Amino acid sequence: MRCLDCDSAAVTERPERTAQRYRRFRCRECGKQFNERSAGVLNRTQYPSDVIALVVLWRLRYRLTLRDLAEMFFIRGIAFSYEAVREWEAKLTPILADELRRRRRRRRLAPSWYVDETYIKVRGRWCYLYRAIDRNGALVDVMLSERRDLAAAKAFFRSAKAVTGAVPDRVTSDGHDSYPQAIRSALGKTVTHRTNVYLNNRLEQDHRGIKGRIRCMRGFGSFVSARRFCRAPALL
């Protein structure tokens, strides 16, 4: 453990603990005191980190509303408001999504990708959720965009290439005219592009999972919150 202020290694553990039983430390160089989760996003919260992590995991993994989660934990003797769940989700979801994306670089994907987009309403406007899976059904990448155009398609393929560290041999999509040029620009001219609605049925069915979770939320209040939520559940 190093000091959070001066980065000194001259740190001494204190005998007392925090209210949540986390260890306290004191820097002998600058005299600052801190605890073992001071550098994290949950430093000021009055609940244990493992409880908050479980709340956010259930929120992303299952079709549960904010009030559902608050009630479930209240029955178990842990009381917090549904607004606390919203705050924890906003803090932890980007961290969780980034870590899951980093770990996916180690996975080996099939050389054939299936790409499609579905519609999600954000503040009364339709946005486009780009998703790609490989031949075996493993997720390649996901991206929410306010537009369905060439720039969005290019951004999605570049993101997929950066996340996976791989380029497919073949990409199957619907007939939208932005895909051919986006594939050539982002993935290269050697990638074969197939346009077939029936071949893409497996991805159409795969949309149901994320759509079902979004349906119970009664919409999104902002594009930022929608993009944040759509990234993590797809990766779980």
Regions found by a protein language model. Name each.
Residues 5-8, 29:
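Short, cysteine/histidine-rich loop/knuckle motifs that typically chelate Zn2+
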Residues 42-49, 87-91, 142-165:
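Active-site beta-loop-alpha junctions of metal-dependent nucleic acid enzymes
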Residues 109-122:
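Two-metal-ion RNase H-like nuclease active-site motif
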Residues 16-60, 81, 87, 104, ...:
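Basic, short loop/linker segments at the boundary and entry of helix-turn-helix/winged-helix-like folds
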